[in-house]
């Protein structure tokens, strides 16, 4: 089959490769010594994300080291809440802390209209990265999906059992929908501006999709994602959109059918047999090596990489992880995975 300069972009458009395109979630991060050096130049994590010279450098580091086919913008899914007017902080040992929304009256202090303008440093980061990337590398913009971002605002923190947001889904669906609508509106403009700045594909992270009852999954994951995708298309955004409903399980085929995403990210628990049986052969999939196995390395890592390559041979497949690269991951193990893929 004909090749393309931008292999990842071609894969998202349905092209099949003997050697699939590859990148890794959280490829720019604490497993890289150069990242730690760059991170030390900022006063805190938000400052790091909002400083284009630093965020662009972090985005480019794994491209220089590994030659990944995709460069994903270095940012955080909670920037949108910060820009909308909810105070966000990242405390060591606590994870993210967010100014909590307790009810409809709190929405008065949230401004989706102003959020996109406040995120202008992110668009500058995108432009800087685009100008510096090799011609064959696809630039991926991203945001959190409405459910996951709203959950942080409702819970007020990242370390949570999610019960408050789940109770809203069951008992206060109209209030939850109001929050998610505001998030979707702000996120659509945010992502559209990323594309205008140079992003060639987009990814929607629904990190808290796991474990939801099927009816609630439809209401808080599928419906808001469908709305967000529609808002982007209405704005004339035509780039591929990768949906990543982590932990969707048996709801994944319905998510693919109903949301309008171009491709789907698979989590660590996904079964290749299930994916190949339930998703159309021409639908692009991305994933899904276990990041903990990437830490361990050895013969089992080699075997799993080959197993995933074989399982998705003949369909559009972007090799990735089922979750992000962890800080303790040896660089040599990442290099080994890339060697196996590139010699497939």
UniProtKB/Swiss-Prot annotation:
Localisation: Cytoplasm
UniProt GO molecular function: uroporphyrinogen decarboxylase activity
Domain of life: Bacteria
Main location: cytoplasm
Residues reported to bind substrate: 26-30, 76, 152, 207, 323
Disulphides: none
Pathway: Porphyrin-containing compound metabolism; protoporphyrin-IX biosynthesis; coproporphyrinogen-III from 5-aminolevulinate: step 4/4
Site positions for Transition state stabilizer: 76
Enzyme class: lyase
Subunit description: Homodimer.
HAMAP family: URO_D (MF_00218)
Role of this protein: Catalyzes the decarboxylation of four acetate groups of uroporphyrinogen-III to yield coproporphyrinogen-III.
Family: Belongs to the uroporphyrinogen decarboxylase family.
Name listed for the protein in its UniProt record: Uroporphyrinogen decarboxylase
Source organism of the structure: Hyphomonas neptunium (strain ATCC 15444)
